[in-house]
């Protein structure tokens, strides 16, 4: 993948970049592997907003992805690399030897015509899926299961990868894209390689309208709201936030304050990710 740049014919075009989609080989999805998806607008069944800044966007059909990679020992040929509007990575259409078709996340280095397979004794090459116990230390992986047979849950976004760091007893240690080191059962499956669309994080949208195409609504500052809407709201003219510490709309500290509260899975985190400049506690 490469990024395409435009001439500055307008303020929006100046600095705008888009993917050149050179790796895409098929424009229309496999109809039997798609299903409709309804927009929620960020609302739950009661109509209350549970996730802000969601709404609108282009209509999409959901591509059914094979997260489990459970057809062990059955070779599959890569028939196409496709765009998926529901995720940042590209997807690959696999034609299995028994006639079945499935979508998987496309890793870097997987091309049309390649043969992929899953199982405990398969080769260590991009796109093949194996139990972690069969993967050598230091291997780059993605689409990692949290529980055996549950399907890939971690490391699924464009350009991301984890690295197998150690094996000890029933568990293996994996370094996540965030830098966190996490323990996972060795019977869990993972796919070899780094995910495609590596330069996705460097794409510049250029204008607000592109965010709206993607279904992202504007993020309004709390300071610009009324007191009824946000703790920072109100005041005459450009007044300050009036708090000793910036807070979220619900009163939680918002500058790097830890909000994770899941003691059940704390034991699986070997080392936390290092805080970046934007999430350093203040």
Curated annotation (Swiss-Prot):
SUPFAM superfamilies noted in UniProt: Nucleic acid-binding proteins, Translation proteins SH3-like domain
Record key words, sorted: Ribonucleoprotein, Ribosomal protein, RNA-binding, rRNA-binding
InterPro entries: NA-bd_OB-fold, Rib_uL2_dom2, Ribosomal_uL2, Ribosomal_uL2_bac/org-type, Ribosomal_uL2_C, Ribosomal_uL2_dom3, Ribosomal_uL2_RNA-bd_dom, Translation_prot_SH3-like_sf
Disordered, as annotated region: 24-55, 209-282
GO annotation, cellular component aspect: large ribosomal subunit
Function, as annotated: One of the primary rRNA binding proteins. Required for association of the 30S and 50S subunits to form the 70S ribosome, for tRNA binding and peptide bond formation. It has been suggested to have peptidyltransferase activity; this is somewhat controversial. Makes several contacts with the 16S rRNA in the 70S ribosome.
Oligomer status and interactors: Part of the 50S ribosomal subunit. Forms a bridge to the 30S subunit in the 70S ribosome.
Protein name as catalogued: Large ribosomal subunit protein uL2
Source species of the chain: Anaeromyxobacter sp. (strain Fw109-5)
Gene this protein is translated from: rplB
């Amino acid at each position: 993948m490469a990024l395409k740049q435009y001439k500055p014919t307008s303020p929006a075009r100046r600095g705008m970049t888009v993917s050149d989609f050179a790796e895409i080989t098929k424009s229309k999805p496999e109809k039997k592997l798609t299903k409709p998806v309804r927009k929620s607008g960020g609302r739950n069944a009661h109509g209350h907003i549970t996730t802000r800044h969601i709404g609108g966007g282009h209509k999409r059909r959901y591509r059914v992805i094979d997260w489990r990679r459970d057809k062990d020992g059955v070779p599959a040929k890569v028939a196409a690399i496709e765009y998926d509007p529901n995720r940042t990575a590209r997807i690959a259409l696999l034609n299995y030897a028994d006639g079945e078709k499935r979508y998987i996340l496309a890793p870097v280095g997987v091309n049309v015509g390649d043969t992929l397979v899953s199982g405990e004794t398969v080769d260590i090459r991009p796109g093949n899926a194996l139990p972690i116990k069969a993967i050598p230390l230091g291997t780059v992986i993605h689409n990692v299961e949290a529980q055996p047979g549950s399907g890939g849950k971690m490391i699924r976004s464009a350009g991301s990868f984890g690295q197998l760091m150690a094996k000890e007893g029933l568990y293996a240690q994996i370094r996540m894209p965030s830098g966190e080191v996490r323990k996972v059962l060795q019977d869990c499956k993972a796919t070899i390689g780094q995910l495609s669309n590596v330069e996705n994080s460097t794409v510049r949208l250029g204008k607000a309208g592109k965010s709206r195409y993607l279904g992202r609504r504007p993020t309004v500052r709390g300071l610009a709201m009324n007191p009824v809407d946000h703790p920072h709201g109100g005041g005459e003219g450009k007044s300050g936030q009036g708090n000793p510490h910036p807070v979220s709309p619900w009163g939680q500290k918002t500058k790097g304050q830890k909000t994770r509260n899941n003691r059940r899975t704390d034991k699986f985190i070997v080392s936390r990710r290092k805080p970046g400049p934007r999430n350093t506690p203040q």
